[in-house]
Amino acid sequence: MRLLSFLLAIAPLLLEGAPQISLTSPTDYEVFQRQTRYEGRVRIAGSVKDAPGAQVEVRLVGSKRKGEWRPVEAAAQGAFDIFVTKPSGGWYHCEARLTKDGQTLAETSVAHVGIGEIFLVAGQSNSANHGEEKQQVRSGMVSSFDRLNWHPADDPQRGASGNSGSFMPPLGDALAAKFGVPIGFIPIGIGATSVREWLPAGVPFPAPPTLVYRVSQLPDGRWESNGVAFTTLVSRQQQFGPRGFRAVLWHQGESDANQKDPTRTLPGSLYQEYLGRIIRDSRHAAGWDAPWFVAQVSYHVPGDEASADIRDAQAALWKKGLALEGPDSDALKGDLRERGGKGVHFSGPGLREHAARWAERITPWLEQQLDQK
């Protein structure tokens, strides 16, 4: 008994000073945006501790080949940070180790690392988790990012509002099947938001949206957004850096179209102006001209199925070259909507059809982008 107590007492001392290696990048299920059809760069970063004279080595292991160990020089404080170029695809297995005199002193790994396509998804409830049925990833090749961590992209999508279904799992599956690479999403949609609520703080507008949680009235009677949604839009882009994701997918418009109080309805001319402002200002803040897909969105319920004014405003952004043409989700009616066709959100079949419509818009454009590089 005395021997056991002694060993337990000195165990922390024995462990103290043991060589250690850890990874801060990549994280599990992280997707890196590929630069060309054929390759992309993975950031491998971490730190070592209590390893004087030891060599840091890293490698990415694919399903068909192990890959060579690559020596990395650690800074005096023990940090290391490099980029490794590899063929597009995944999942890769990232490994890092400490060696000295032919012996492995410590090692660590990350199981799922992808080089593929990343999309930021923004807008209101039908861009988020408010569909009738939660969707699941079928391919095993789709993940999403919640500001801090990556996860398999099963609904609900962390980072967006709501706790039910979205179109992202089936869209990711469709794109992964088409392009043969992992797909990543950055979900930031907020249910019930007007385009006015996505404006930067300090941009005045004449009348508030129906819900006023994210806006406030100015002394002169006009209104402004609190800027939180815009800040999130910009900060996510900045996290990934210039060309660190492929495009923004914007799905929004219901909360600006045909409101019960007509004074809360946004004229199409202002919708076009405000969304154009959001696109331009977010590009400037992010430091690059991220492509935007803008869907046609204004459907509420049967009998209130479209606003020509809002639809024309959305289409005007395509025609001006400020945005790319997204799907026409107003066309999804009947049993593709929740509650047997009575609601504004999508049913399970509607979410899958919504995903298919997005894939139809994204695929030819993405093929063209990949052919240019």
Where are these predicted regions, by residue range?
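Bacterial N-terminal signal peptides
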Residues: S5-L13
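Cell-envelope and extracellular/periplasmic
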Residues: A18-K373
